[in-house]
A protein has these predicted regions:
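Bacterial Sec-dependent N-terminal signal peptides
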Residues: 1-22
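Accessory carbohydrate-recognition regions in carbohydrate-active enzymes
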Residues: 21-358, 362-405, 411-469, 477, ...
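ATP-dependent phospho-/nucleotidyl transfer catalytic cores
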Residues: 474
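Conserved catalytic core of nucleotide polymerization and phosphodiester-bond processing enzymes
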Residues: 697
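Extracellular attachment/recognition segments
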Residues: 706
Length: 743
């Protein structure tokens, strides 16, 4: 009877799967507008449509916000001020090296308010490799297809003798020069939001395929006809054409952080290529990268959400290197202002991305992360510290020393080809020092932490419990890396011991993490719903679970797994109450938790994103399967409001990618992934070594979210974790799904 039931289920699964969509061109399922329906008070991603190649040096976006506004593109806007080259990782960090262009017809009105044109999303096309928009006020259409350091632009003008093309180099010091004989505009911008040396510039070049019938420059808002150059606080260049309806002006654009000469060299990425060729090559590159994961499903919306998240997972960290005349990688250093050999990457905050973004790279795109690790070697050599938030240089943002996790996870999972000994020195140094001017780099409060075993609450160092918990985990990562490198027991002993420091801020009375004073007493009064204060963008209910490396030890502190599970349950059962007095207002992360109707679970921010998977450790995997499916169903879509908080440079997207595949790296630095619940009927992960991970979920639908049986390569698999080394060899995982939790 049981065998007959299994055969029947298998036949039903086959019938259902016959309706599954087989994805042939994954980039066609990407919506770059996901997360753009955001504002300062409420984030649905805080993204912009990044028109770019994977890990490109330059991104492009339509600009709806004012110059310098971190919300550069907002879905609810109805006017476009320009098409901007951007390097912005988030609205909170803001942009650097940005400039914009704008087609205009009729009157010579070039300030950003006056030139802004109405547009409609119905006349807008946004893909990762191609952007098109109709500028209604000018009856003109803009198209753009990018490469990593250049782009091909095509403008379709109406019939007019006043077809203008504006280049806005923005304020804070800029320069433009028009070269009529070469049909070219060159210039530079110095605009930035910090993290750069005094000699920072982004040099740009624009080359046209039509002669200029008008030339002019604006110096700080004043237009001078026939002026061919301007160097001032805010420089702009304007060239004009006489066009017939449907006539197209082609522009090739490139830039460099190194020099104008290097910008011309970078222009070779599009030289000699038609617009359609650049567009086709961009699409092919995206399909190559996204196609590393094939998924099949009968729900097209699931496919769109998945590939939109995978797209966000392969944008950052951005390349910050270029190629010299001999084809060797070189970079302008945002740490010391020199042009040096080698790779460099930037625009990521490890507080966010150590959790699942870098583990995703290590599994699916390891050769890219090997370059990133080589870039970290250079960052350390050039600044004396590994970055914790880089954009493009060190930025004072967030807490923790999580570069240690990024370094350890890569090496432990087999990445090679870079100077690991220098990175070892870097992580050890960063664990015992703080940057002299950027307090989030290194470890603020390390003296207290090393001596007392925690960062005290009452010594003037904010977010002390968050720091303690993250330092303890980072010490564990350093210890694991040291074991892999066969460092001496004496050298490793401090890190081994300090990995248990999380216990020093655990309050047995409340079973929660709590601020602790220098004399050993716990902070009073204590409100576990209070955001900030001893924690970073969260409260004690969120941060208590930040013991990635020792969930079993945390459970024992609580009194055992029964209490552990009760505490986990409480996160969802509690009302979404909060105390925002530390900030003096309700920060957007609080509001996002409040409105999602999931109790005190705050998936819109990173500290708690791994928490659901902790049920695997405590013997209740069906709760993982229930809640992971709830999060994927309710908190992610492929719409402009598709995230439940900041997307954060690939982290929140990588969470979805892993979770939809059915497993997740709870503890980067270890070799294990915890099993969740597969979202798709079938998925294939094509590894760089030529092996394939095949994941099949029979009888899978929203009701049948519970795993009844797992087999690996045809044999029953009794565990709720997967080993990295086993996955690298290629495996076939089969999940039999059902509507009831297994007994």
């Amino acid at each position: 009877m049981k065998r007959l039931l299994l055969i029947t289920l298998a036949m039903l699964s086959y019938i259902i799967n016959c309706n599954a969509v087989v994805v042939k061109s994954p980039v066609d399922y990407v919506n770059p507008l996901v997360g753009t329906a955001s504002k300062r008070e409420l984030s649905t991603g805080n993204t912009y449509p990044a028109i770019a190649l994977p890990w490109a040096m330059n991104f492009w976006t339509a600009q709806t916000g004012k110059m310098g506004d971190g919300w550069t593109y907002v879905y609810g806007a109805d006017k476009i001020r320009g098409i901007k080259q951007t390097h912005q990782p988030s609205p909170w960090i803001n942009d650097y090296g940005q400039f914009a262009f704008m087609p205009i017809t009729g009157k010579k009105v070039f300030d950003e308010e006056g030139r802004a044109s109405w547009f409609s999303h119905k006349a807008e096309t946004a893909t990762p490799y191609y952007y098109k928009v109709y500028l209604a006020d000018y009856d003109a259409t803009v198209e753009l297809s990018p490469t990593s350091r250049a782009a091909s632009v095509r403008i379709t003008y109406p019939t007019t003798n006043e077809a203008y093309f504006l280049v806005d180099a923005f304020d804070k010091g800029s320069s433009v020069t028009i070269l009529p004989d070469k049909r070219t505009i060159v210039g530079y911008t110095t605009k930035n939001s910090g993290g750069v040396p005094d000699n920072f510039k982004n040099y740009f070049i624009l080359r046209f395929d039509h002669d200029f019938v008008y030339k002019g420059c604006l110096s700080d808002g004043k237009l001078i006809d026939n002026q061919l150059s301007a160097t001032c606080n805010h420089a702009m260049a304007v060239v004009g054409f006489q066009t017939k309806r449907g006539e197209q002006i082609n522009v090739q654009v490139a830039s460099s952080f190194i020099s104008e000469e290097q910008a011309f060299r970078n222009l070779k990425e599009v030289e000699g290529k038609s617009f359609e060729q650049v567009k086709a090559e961009g699409k092919a590159e995206w399909n190559k990268v996204l196609g590393r994961i094939e998924v099949e499903d009968d729900n097209v919306d699931h496919l769109r959400t998945f590939y939109s998240c995978l797209y966000r997972s392969v944008l950052f960290p951005r390349s910050f290197y270029e190629f010299d005349a001999e084809g060797k990688p070189i970079h302008y250093s945002p740490y010391n202002g020199k042009v040096l050999e080698g790779y460099l990457f930037t625009d990521t905050g490890y507080w966010d991305t150590f959790r699942s973004l870098f583990p995703l790279l290590n599994l699916i795109y390891p050769s890219m992360n090997e370059k990133m690790q080589a870039g970290l070697v250079n960052a350390y050599r050039e600044s004396g510290f590994l970055p914790e938030w880089a954009s493009p240089g060190h930025r004072d943002c967030m807490v923790g020393n999580n570069s240690a996790s990024v370094v350890a996870d890569a090496y432990i999972k087999g990445l090679r080809g870079y100077d690991i000994e220098t990175l070892w020195k870097a992580v050890v140094h960063g664990a015992n020092a703080v940057h002299p001017t950027i307090s989030s780099t290194g470890r603020k409060g390390f003296e207290y932490y090393n001596r007392l075993g925690y960062v005290p609450y009452n010594v003037g160092i904010n977010e002390s419990v968050a720091r303690t918990l993250e330092y303890a985990y980072d010490d564990w990562c350093i210890y694991q890396l040291g074991l892999k490198l066969r460092k001496s027991a004496k050298e490793l002993q401090p890190f081994k011991e300090r990995a248990m420091n999380y216990k020093n801020v655990f309050d047995k009375e409340t079973c929660l993490m709590r601020g602790r004073n220098a004399d050993g007493s716990f902070q009073k009064p204590f409100n576990p719903y209070k955001w900030g204060d001893a924690f970073t963008e969260g409260n004690s209910w969120h941060y208590t679970w930040s013991v990635f490396h020792d969930p079993s030890g945390l459970a024992q502190l609580m009194g055992g797994y029964d209490k552990f599970n009760t505490m986990l349950d409480s996160v969802f059962n509690l009302p979404p109450v909060f105390d925002d007095t530390y900030y003096g207002f309700t920060i957007h992360e609080i509001r996002e938790m409040q409105i999602m109707h999931m109790g005190n679970y705050a998936h819109g921010n990173q500290p708690i994103q791994h928490m659901i998977y902790l049920y695997d450790y405590s013997g209740q995997p069906w709760k993982v399967q229930y809640w992971i499916r709830e999060v994927m169903n309710r908190l992610y879509t492929a719409q402009p409001d598709g995230y439940c908080g900041d997307e954060d440079n690939g982290q929140t997207s990588a969470w979805y990618v892993f979770s939809a595949l059915g497993f997740y790296p709870v503890c980067p630095g270890s070799t294990q992934y915890m099993i969740g619940t597969p979202y798709f009927h079938k998925a294939k992960i094509h590894l760089e070594n030529g092996k394939t991970i095949t994941i099949c979920a029979e009888n899978n639908n929203d009701d049948n979210r519970y795993i009844q049986l797992i087999t690996m390569d045809g044999q029953p698999y009794p565990h709720y974790y997967l080993e990295h080394d086993k996955l690298k060899k290629g495996v076939s995982l089969n999940f039999m799904m059902g509507e009831r939790k297994p007994i």
